[in-house]
Amino acid sequence: MAATVVRAALAGCFMLGAALANSAEVPPPAYQLIALPAGVPSEVLYSVALQESGTRLRGQIVPWPWTLNVAGAGYRFATRSDACRALMLALQTAGPSRVDVGLGQTNIGANGHRYSYPCEGLDPYKNLSVTAQILAEQKAKGGDWITAAGRYHRPAGGEPAARYRRAFAKHLSRVTGINLMANNP
């Protein structure tokens, strides 16, 4: 019995080591749990969050859940309640189409219907779920995940989507440990 347990533990360690050898950075568990049912690789979801809400913390870039972008200006808040108050004010002053929210910076004007109320976009799990849904929808239109990420950012395409693809590909390369080239369809 003990030998079976030891063999199973060694096999698990080997598999974990093999996975880590092929990946420069393992996405946090929430990204893995949310990405799988949506059919999105967790590395893609995590890389989008790094691109959208990444901030430097203790020398590393990490996604920040209480991030807003209002009319092109980024804001990070220490608490969800502070971010919610600022979000409600931003919706009144700038309008929903000029406000992005949360880890995936989902635009309230285009995607507000995916939330029960605006501040739900600051719930990290809900925001990641919405982000994964949008990514899956964009991937279903064709192309690879880099192309889908470009459409996630700007469905109309053009140079803003191309810039986003290049920046996203850098994050995805870091996360996967694979040097990726962003295509420009």
Summary of predicted features, one role per range:
Residues M1-A3:
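N-terminal secretory signal peptides that target proteins for export/translocation
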Residues R7-A18:
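Bacterial N-terminal signal peptides
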Residues N22-P185:
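Catalytic glycan-binding domains that act on GlcNAc-containing polysaccharides
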